[in-house]
From Swiss-Prot:
Known partners and oligomeric status: Component of the CSN complex, composed of COPS1/GPS1, COPS2, COPS3, COPS4, COPS5, COPS6, COPS7 (COPS7A or COPS7B), COPS8 and COPS9. In the complex, it probably interacts directly with COPS2, COPS4, COPS5, COPS7 (COPS7A or COPS7B) and COPS9. Interacts with the translation initiation factor EIF3S6. Interacts weakly with RBX1. Directly interacts with COP1 and 14-3-3 protein sigma/SFN. Interacts with ERCC6.
Assigned protein family: Belongs to the peptidase M67A family. CSN6 subfamily.
The entry's keywords: Cytoplasm, Nucleus, Signalosome
GO cellular component, one term: COP9 signalosome
Organism field: Mus musculus (Mouse)
Protein name, entry field: COP9 signalosome complex subunit 6
Recorded name of the encoding gene: Cops6
Length: 324
């Protein structure tokens, strides 16, 4: 209302103000300060980027991805430490989260990271829109006051394209409406994360940066295998052309190809068979020992339950004997 009044008073300058107001997303709350302090780990950003890149490679076009945020919360301090992907379906142009998949993944993460809890969800794209509100309401059915993180992988800015929001309820036109309030966040890193981020930073897209020893070794191996493949393919094409009579026989080249084939390791020797069978027996024995251990554990649980049941029945008999 105040913006409209200012627009009417200022004439042409007011129309400019109305355009600015129209550009503000309708799902954003204005004049609201964050109620929590957020510390974001680089691992979360790397996970989201990897998730988006894999989906873009599989689909051949940029895709919106959705996942869960996990970490720790102490009072008003929230530390987002990790994330995992979520399954979603589109029904009538609305995104529906697969909650059964979420509960399965949550149980798996609880077995490994018992101290971490579900904090919210993430997605990719531009500024928040009503579709994000729709998904956020579904997440609110799982936990109260979840965080919402949005990463824009298509931005051209040099700043980190990550925004964190919390939901607030505002009265608009007499109705309670859910809106997003942006939160400020800080980056928190551990030693392992610093090493990983430094390694990724060195691996630039142009290759002009300093590469790690492992990366250089893998690149050299890839180049050598690629060269070997092209040379073997050339020899094979020459042999086929010679057999078909398309090119004259060159006995020197054929002898060299024959000698090259005999340089390959022979896998039909007795020593290879002995080592191969020994390794197979070792693997089979390890699997067998694992099965025996699991069976013993099951039997132990059965015996414990049987003993508990037997003790209860014995106590019941003694108690009945006392009454008689």
């Amino acid at each position: 209302m105040a913006a409209a009044a200012a627009a009417g008073a200022n004439g042409s300058g007011g129309s400019s103000g109305m355009e600015v107001d129209a550009a503000v997303p309708s799902v954003m709350a204005s004049g609201v300060t964050g109620s929590v302090s957020v510390a974001l780990h680089p691992l979360v950003i790397l996970n989201i980027s990897d998730h988006w890149i894999r989906m873009r490679s599989q689909e051949g076009r940029p895709m919106q991805v959705i996942g869960a945020l996990i970490g720790k919360q102490e009072g008003r301090n929230i530390e987002v430490m990790n994330s995992f992907e979520l399954l979603s379906h589109t029904v009538e142009e609305k995104i529906i989260i697969d909650k059964e998949y979420y509960y399965t993944k949550e149980e798996q993460f609880k077995q490994v990271f018992k101290e971490l809890e579900f904090l919210g969800w993430y997605t990719t794209g531009g500024p928040p829109d009503p579709s994000d509100i729709h998904v956020h309401k579904q997440v609110c059915e799982i936990i109260e006051s979840p965080l919402f993180l949005k990463l824009n992988p298509m931005t051209k800015h040099t700043d980190l394209p990550v925004s964190v929001f919390e939901s607030v309820i505002d009265i608009i036109n007499g109705e309670a409406t859910m809106l997003f309030a942006e939160l400020t966040y800080t980056l928190a890193t551990e030693e392992a994360e610093r090493i990983g981020v430094d390694h990724v930073a060195r691996m630039t897209a142009t290759g002009s940066g300093e590469n790690s020893t492992v990366a250089e070794h893998l690149i050299a191996q890839h180049s050598a295998i690629k060269m070997l493949h092209s040379r073997v393919k050339l020899i094979l094409e020459y042999v086929k052309a010679s057999e078909a009579g398309e090119v004259p026989f060159n006995h020197e080249i054929l002898r060299e190809a024959y000698a090259l084939c005999h340089c390959l390791p022979v896998l039909s020797t007795d020593k290879f068979k002995t080592d191969f069978y020994d390794q197979c027996n070792d693997v089979g024995l390890m699997a067998y020992l694992g099965t025996i251990t699991k069976t013993c554990n099951t039997m132990n649980q059965f015996v414990n339950k049987f003993n508990v049941l037997y003790d209860r029945q014995g106590i019941g008999r003694r108690m009945r004997g006392l009454f008689f």
